[in-house]
Amino acid sequence: MAFRVLLLFSLTALLIFSAVSPSFAASSSDDVDDEDLSFLEDLKEDDVPGADSLSSSTGFDEFEGGEEEDPDMYNDDDDEEGDFSDLGNPDSDPLPTPEIDEKDVVVIKERNFTDVIENNQYVLVEFYAPWCGHCQSLAPEYAAAATELKEDGVVLAKIDATEENELAQEYRVQGFPTLLFFVDGEHKPYTGGRTKETIVTWVKKKIGPGVYNLTTLDDAEKVLTSGNKVVLGYLNSLVGVEHDQLNAASKAEDDVNFYQTVNPDVAKMFHLDPESKRPALVLVKKEEEKISHFDGEFVKSALVSFVSANKLALVSVFTRETAPEIFESAIKKQLLLFVTKNESEKVLTEFQEAAKSFKGKLIFVSVDLDNEDYGKPVAEYFGVSGNGPKLIGYTGNEDPKKYFFDGEIQSDKIKIFGEDFLNDKLKPFYKSDPIPEKNDEDVKIVVGDNFDEIVLDDSKDVLLEVYAPWCGHCQALEPMYNKLAKHLRSIDSLVITKMDGTTNEHPKAKAEGFPTILFFPAGNKTSEPITVDTDRTVVAFYKFLRKHATIPFKLEKPASTESPKTAESTPKVETTETKESPDSTTKSSQSDSKDEL
């Protein structure tokens, strides 16, 4: 304890001295720049522990492309909604491609891009990659939507972004698939679902009226048998205040079709009492709870709240098609039940009963653990293992968190868990590999359960690489990173570490891609870490650490620049008298690429 107090006192005095002595700090910076650092690159790779043991894994087979596996794994755009893409791992095995009739999907190349966009008022464009699993899953739905929307004068097109790089860069494609909707040459992001029905509904809302009139029984029958989610307003008049409120509400829901009628017989087909007081409204969907009646004030805000709360099934079954609907919903908290088919009957009944109390507040999701394509990979992502049903709460916002339920799957206990989840009374869960029994290599292994002990040790400056075993950029970085650690291993105040970001989590180690390299200065572990953005060389990293380390250090050039073979020949440490201000840091002009999550 006394040592920590003395250390913090010394660091405080040192920082104050540096702050009031800019010229002195500048001279220290010049000293770094003037150092002969060529010896740092002299260490041969053969002398670096682990240089010949790069991960043999070159693909993320459980999750095509690895992108699903960031905390926002079900979204599309890295800058807007996370990343529901396959960007970053083209080496993974592509899914088998079924026979798809794409006769109505226009193939766009750079040479015909302008013609397609300028000669058609409405164009939906998909940027894809041949190896992208999500693109392959989308293809049949996209093709079917193209055929249906052709009658409305809408063109659906696709662009192979791996061949048309300039187009992909021009439209800032950061993940696959990326869909853009062009109207008279102007584009905006597509934010709809991944099924034919949701694509068609989204596009029709953008090109037509928000509310359609239903005047005949034949038209009503077609709507009811379409399989789409439908809202029907039973109004006093097809124009006026009631219509205006319904139309305004329709603009807020891209995946629900809105209709209106004044015909009592049509209303009856939609399970509305023809003699009921107007305006009345009903939502019809194909799930188990098919009919939901509105009983509030007929104004936009109340209508939107009602539709948002009732359009999903009581319990949504997780599939690739339903993932966007679940995780891109305005409701950002979900309860996920992981269960096998043998366990599902009784458990799902309890789960559904609890769901009735949380409409519009929580989304209830069941995940089939027997499903090899998505059930088991999703369970692995969430850290679900072992036998028996598992229930977790998931907050799918910019700071995703997971909460594990510990108890018997009964509706009353699920309700208590759900209320505590809504009121932020639960402790989040973070994944962790087992703490290694031995951890004496130059690069220390960090896992979720020893993160605080190693990385958040206030007496140490700590460099952390968050990597993925399948990440090619991480594999390329490893020899240099090991070399850096070997050079710096005699500096007691500095720790070089790495953590597998696919199997370990910590709120202080948020990675938007792999590798992510973070620096945690001594004496300042409560602040956010510094993201290392510099050249991927030993010299560049050494300079970065010299500039940012709270506890100053300096390596002396060895008497001989031959590759050190023993611990005795490791460069000596020379402690300097001052530390440079972090404000003097300048970023390298060249940033290394990283594998997107």
Swiss-Prot record:
Its EC number is 5.3.4.1. Disulfide bonds join C132-C135, C471-C474. A motif (Prevents secretion from ER) lies at residues 594-597. Keywords: Cell wall, Disulfide bond, Endoplasmic reticulum, Glycoprotein, Golgi apparatus, Isomerase, Nucleus, Redox-active center, Repeat, Secreted, Signal, Vacuole. Residues 1-25 form the signal peptide. Glycans are attached at N112, N213, N342, N524. Residues 85-208, 429-550 form the Thioredoxin domain. GO terms for molecular function: protein disulfide isomerase activity. SUPFAM superfamilies: Thioredoxin-like. Residues 560-573 have a biased composition (Polar residues). The record marks G133, H134, G472, H473 as: Contributes to redox potential value. Its main location: endoplasmic reticulum. It is an enzyme of class 5 (isomerase). It catalyses: Catalyzes the rearrangement of -S-S- bonds in proteins. The active site is at C132, C135, C471, C474. One of its GO terms (cellular component) is plant-type vacuole. Residues 37-49, 61-84 have a biased composition (Acidic residues). The record marks R194 as: Lowers pKa of C-terminal Cys of first active site. Interacts with MEE8 and MED37A. Belongs to the protein disulfide isomerase family. Acts as a protein-folding catalyst that interacts with nascent polypeptides to catalyze the formation, isomerization, and reduction or oxidation of disulfide bonds. This is Protein disulfide isomerase-like 1-4. It comes from Arabidopsis thaliana.
